UniProtKB/Swiss-Prot annotation:
Protein name listed in UniProt: Protein tortoise
Cystine crosslinks: none
Parts forming coiled coils: 43-78, 694-733
Function field: Required for efficient chemotaxis.
Gene Ontology BP term (one): aggregation involved in sorocarp development
Free-text disruption phenotype from the record: Mutants have no defect in cAMP signaling or motility, but are unable to respond to a spatial gradient with directed movement.
Amino acid sequence: MNKTIIINNVSKYIKFKNYYSSSSTILKKKTSEIYKIKGLDIKDRKELYSLNNDSIKKKLNQLKDETNQLLKERGEELMKDLSKTLNLTSDNLKYNITKSPFTLRAYLLAANQGISFYHHELRKQINPTDDYERQKRKDLVYKLQSQEIDSLTSGGANKKKSPFLEDNNNKKSMSIEREMEIIREQQQEQQHFDQQMSNSTKWEMSQLEIQPRIDTFRQDELFVSFNPYESMSTNSQSYQLVSRLSKFVWNKELTNWEMFSSSKLNQLIPQLQLHILDKINLNNDNDNDNSIIINQFLESIKFISNEINSTDLNIFKTLNSSNNNNNSSENIIEVENGGDFKKIINNSIVDSLIYMKGHHFRITSDPFILFFQQLKENQDYFTSNEDYKQFLEKLLDTLLFETIEFDPTSTTTINGNRQFEYKLKLDLLQREAFRQFKVYQVFNTSPDAKRHEESDLRKLAHLCKTLQKRSTSDFIQESKKYLSPQILSNGLLNSNKLLVATSSSNELNQSKTSISISQLTDGLHSCIPATMSLLEFSIKNSSKDNILFDTFDGKLKNINSLDDLITKFANSKYIYLRESLSQRFSMFIQSSNNTTDNNTTTDTNDNDIIIGLNNPIYKLLIDLEDKVLELSQNNFEENPIENWIGCLSIELGDEDDNIEYKDTDQFNVIASQNFNLVRINNQMLAQLHKTFSEDLDFQIEELELMIKNKKILEREIKAHNEKISKIIKDSRDSTTPTFYFIGIQDDQVYTLEIPNEWEPVWNLLKSYPNGLLLKDFIDKQTFVTKEAFLSTLTDLNKYGVVGLFPKN
C-alpha cells in the first residue's frame, strides 16, 4: 500500500527500484527532501486581533526562531533547491530569504507555483524590429536597389528586370514604376520606424530601459524580472513575487471600472509584503522599537483586510481625496509608521488608475483575448471582483499562518505538465500575444496590418490548440516552427533544457536558446564598444603565428566568435551581480581563468573556465571606457554652471594666438572640472582605445573600394591586421605607469597622455579652485623650460583641460 501512495504506477516503481531497495527507504528519502515552514502559531486574523503586544511579540519571535533553525540545519540545501527553481543565484537568495520569515514564505509559495525569475537583460524586449513582415519588405527594397546599382554600373547594357520576382512559369516581372513605389513606401516607413524606435525600449547609458514606462509592470505576467540595476537594499523581488501570487481579474467584457478596482486590489498584499512583512525584525533589546513594529504590523494587516473588502463608495472617496493630492505610492519609499503605510495604499489608487488607462486596450485586444482563454479560471485568474476578494483573503492567511511545504522534486501537475513547464509554455504564448499587440496596435509599422495580423493570429491559435492537446516537447517544436527565436529568448536560464532542440549537439548553441545574446551584445557595445571590438578582432585573428591571447595556440577554448564569449558571460554568476554591465563583464573576464562558476543557476563544468583572458589590458580598457561613459552621462545631464570654465575660457588656436612668457602676467589659469588626471600602468592604452574606437569594418570596406586587384587587396588587408595586432601585443606587454588627462569638451571625449611630472603640477593647479596668475603658476614648476611648459599649457587649453582668462 505504501508503494501505491509514493509511486503512482508500476513503471515509476521499476524506475526507482534500482536506487532504493524498499518502500521504507523511498519514504525516508522523499520525506527528507520536503521543507516544512510553519506560519504564525495563530489560528486566523480574528485571533491575531485579540492578542496584546506581548503575545504577538512572542508569536513573531517563535516564528523567527523556527525559521532560523530551519536555515541553520538545511539553509544551504534549501538555497540550492530554490536557486534552481527560481532561477536566482544563492547569494541573491541568501540576502533576501533571511530578511524576514515572511520573505522566505513568499519565495516558497512562488516556487510551489512554478514562478521563476527571468533576467531583465537576457529577455528579448519587444520593439519595432519585431515586425517581421517589415524586415521582409526591407529585404525586398535592398534587392531592388542593389539591382538598380548593378544596372547603372553595367552601363545599361542589360534591360532592367526583377528576376528574383519571376517564377519558372514566366509570370510578369515587377514593373519599374512599382519598384520605385515600393522604395518610396519603404522610405516613408523608415521614417515612422525610426520615430517608434526612439520611443521604444533601448540601451541608455549601459542600462536597458523599458519604454514606455507603463510596460515595466504587467499584473498578468507569469514570471518575475530580475533587474541588476536595482540596489540590493531596496530591491522589490518579493513585491513582484507576491504580485504574481495575487493573480488578477479578467473577462472578455472587462470594463474600465472593473479593471481599475481589481488593479487596486492586486497591489494590496504585495505592498504589505514589501513595506511591512519583509521588515519584521524585532529587536529584543529595545521594547520601544518592538512596540512600534508590532503596532505597525497589526494595524497594517487590519487596514489591508478592510481594503480588500472596501466598498465602491469608499473608493470614490479615496479618488476624490487623491484628486487634491496627486501622489503615487512610489513617492513614499520607507515606511516609518502605520500612517505612512496607509498613505502608500491610498496613493496607490493613482497607480491603479494609470495602470487601467495604460493596459485596458491591451488586455481586451484580440491576441490577449486568445491568450487569456488558455488560462484556468479561478486558478490563473478570476472573472469577478467578488471571487477575487475571497482569493486574496485566503492568500493573506496563507502568508501569515499556514504551514508551507516545498518539495523540489514534486510532480504536482496541471494537465500532465509540471507547474514551471505549464507557465513556460503560457509565457511563450503571452510573449507572442504581446508582440502582435505592440506591432499591430502600437507601432503601426505595417502598411497591410490587417492581413498580417490575421495570419499571425491564426498561428497563435494553432499554438494554443497545441498547448491543450499535445505534449510539452511537441508544443516546443511547434513554437520553434511558428515563433521567432526572439520570442523563445525569455531570459529564463532554467528553461534551456526544455527549449533546446533534441538534435542540437552544440553545447553553446543550447545554452543561448533562452537568452537574447544579440540584446546583451548591444548593451555591451553601448558601454564598452572598444573592448568589444578588441575582443572580436582578437578572436578572429589570433593564431599560433599571431598570438593575441595567453594560450599556446593563441585560441580561446570553445570560443570561436564574440557571441560564444558573451554566451559564456550570460550563463555565469556575474550576470546576476548588482553592478554596472561593464563591471560585471570585467569581473567575468578577470575570473574566467581560475574560477568555476559554482554559484550559477545552470550546470557548470570545466568548459566554463576560459583560459587566456588573464591579461590586465581588458580591465584597464573597460575602466577607461567606464570613465568615458560617466563623463558622457554627466555632460548629457550638464548644468551649464558646472562647465563654466570650458564655456568662458579663451581658446588658443593658431600659433599667432599663442601666449609668450612675457605676457603671462596678463592671464589667469584655472583647472577644468571636466577633466581628471588618471594614472594607468600601461603607456599604450590611449592608442589601443583610439584604434578600437574606430570602425575597423569600414576601414576594410574602404580598402575593398579602392583596390580592385585581389592579391594586392589581400596583402593590404593582411598588413592592416598585422598593424593592429602589433598594437594589441604592445599594449598587452606594457606595464609602464602613464598619466592621462581624461575628460570631455564640446561633446567630445579626450584621452590625452601627459608626462608623469605633471602629477604634482596638476595637483597644484587644482589646489587653486579659483585660479591663479599664469606667470606664478609657470614659475612654480622646474622640470622643463618655461617656454616648453607654456606650449604644453597652450595645447591643454585647446582641449579644454585648462581655462585661460585675460586679467582685468
